[in-house]
Amino acid sequence: VIMNCCRYINRTNFEIELLVGDRVVPEYADECERLGIQIIRLPLKHEYTRQYYVKLFKILRDKKYDIFHVHGNSAMVTPDLFLAHLAGIRLNLVHAHNTTCDYPVIHRLLSPFFRLMYKKGLACSIQAGQWMFGKNRFEVLHNGIETGIYRYNQEKRKEFRKKIHMKEEFLIGHAGQFDAQKNQRFLLKVFAQTAEKQENIRLLLAGNGPDFEEIMDEIDKHPYKERIIVLGDSSQMDYVYNAVDLFVLPSLFEGLPLVLVEAQAAGLTCLVSDRVSHEADLSGNIEFLPVDSTDVWENAIKREICKKEDRQKKSENAQKRILENEYDAKNSVLKLQKIYQDLSEEFGNVRREI
């Protein structure tokens, strides 16, 4: 989402700097450098919390940004907003990306203060906005994608499957941060149960995150570890979607994940946790399943293995519906630009530094 903004925003009118308190994908860092966008690295927020806030305040005080646009999942962004207020930044935007968080009690305690701290609330979906902002007003800004990149391409499929040594095997794909929310441990259980009876299936995991090492340890002990491929972070997700035959996302909670929009654009059927916003079904190719039963997921995978579908046609139809529903990256960024412009004009800012 942030990278699409960096790619398509009018940099004649807007200057962007990224303040990052997490690990940065190297390919994204390289792209930002090519685009002339500075990434200011903060101490890792979850490991060095005090140092993170100290450095954040110094930067906000020195830079005096016109707009401070915060991405988060809960009212735990309140300290960031408070520091921006102390630093004299008047235009604070909050962008919600999830429908719950790891610390819901703290979220509820901070919510009354949080809702006094921002000028504009944005959300990737209605459910995410309701979770984050309660009865306060917010605007839905869809997580747009570059639709053309994800269009199904047989040559990309052949190339990537050759790269990962896949022939005619049925390849199940998953992409997401390795953490409790994305529920990879449940997925590994489902795969073990399904692989026991289906010799021709494989599992591909793309992503990284705080639980990466622990999940890798579980894979090492997995009865079918030789059938599991771990990519880590990948800048070739368009190739990944083309290579796989089915996409799975058993998350414990989500707003409207970008990976689901991308997977649908590539003509994939997606098996998705029923805790994910149903707004994510843009193509009619999503099946929502409970995450308390491995049997249900196993049966759904079996059904997909037996299907013979025209991926090219599915991709074309899905792309039309994605565009109709305004999930195109360029349109999303144009909408965000308008939000920035309106706020700047309303509050008299002219530099438009974000």
Model region roles, listed by residue range:
Residues 309-353:
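A charged, aromatic-enriched C-terminal amphipathic alpha-helix characteristic of glycosyltransferases
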Residues 1-4, 170, 174-193, 210-216:
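A conserved mid-protein helix/loop that constitutes part of the nucleotide-sugar donor-binding site
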Residues 151-166, 306:
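A short helix/loop element that forms part of the nucleotide-sugar donor recognition site in Leloir-type
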Residues 19-20, 269-273, 278:
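Short hydrophobic beta-strand element within catalytic cores of glycosyltransferases
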Residues 4-51, 210-211, 339, 347, ...:
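N-terminal strand-loop element at the rim of the active site
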Residues 211-215, 225-234, 240:
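Active-site donor-binding acidic/aromatic loop of nucleotide-activated sugar
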Residues 73, 233, 252:
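Aromatic "clamp/platform" in nucleotide-sugar-dependent glycosyltransferases that forms part
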